[in-house]
Design a protein with these regions (language model features):
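Generic structural signal for well-ordered alpha-helices
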Residues: 122-126
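Interdomain helical linkers/hinges and coiled-coil/dimerization scaffolds
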Residues: 1-121, 142-167, 171
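Catalytic core regions of nucleotide second-messenger enzymes
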Residues: 94-100, 127-140
């Protein structure tokens, strides 16, 4: 019973942390915080946002067949874990959950490295999602790099604009 309580508490704390980080990124991307507030909030979550260039990448991924077998579900969960672990290995990427099927990645680095880190991220996602047994529907939307945190709202607006084209002009 004590273990159940501790497990439940740990899960609730993790959910709260994820919600809070998501809320923080919502505020940043909607332009609701000034730069000082962004850095203060980021410090609360031990997020280092220092860089000379920023970009956003949104990854939408879901299981190809909603009612797939347990094996297919496990394969899909493993796929998600592989993708997320890639981003967690590099300080140039800050990963956050955006919604049920979407993860956001803040890419932060020097301007001359931005194209490389962005392309590496896309290549890694593509490699994972197009593997023989991935069983995933996916797409990535990438913004246009900006030089200041205060400009992330513009980058986010472009990502939303680019993402809308997926529905207006499906492949």
């Amino acid at each position: 019973e004590q273990e159940d309580f501790q497990s439940k508490l740990a899960n609730e704390m993790h959910e709260y942390e994820q919600f809070s980080i998501r809320h923080f990124f919502e505020q940043v991307l909607e332009g609701e915080l000034c730069v000082t507030e962004i850095y203060d909030e980021a410090a609360k979550w031990s997020l280092d946002l220092s860089a000379s260039c920023y970009n956003l990448l949104f990854l939408y991924v879901q299981q190809e067949k909603e009612n797939g077998s347990e094996r297919e579900m496990n394969t899909f969960v493993h796929l998600q874990e592989e993708i997320l672990q890639y981003f967690l290995r590099f300080p140039q990427y800050i990963l956050f959950r955006w919604n049920v099927n979407c993860y956001g990645v803040l890419v932060k680095c020097d301007a001359e490295e931005m194209e490389d880190y962005t392309q590496r991220a896309i290549a890694q996602i593509q490699m994972n999602c197009e593997s023989q047994n991935a069983n995933a529907d996916w797409y990535v939307v990438v913004g246009t790099p900006v030089e200041r945190l205060s400009m992330l709202k513009e980058c986010y607006d472009r990502v939303n604009h680019y993402g809308a084209y997926r529905f207006l002009y499906p492949q």
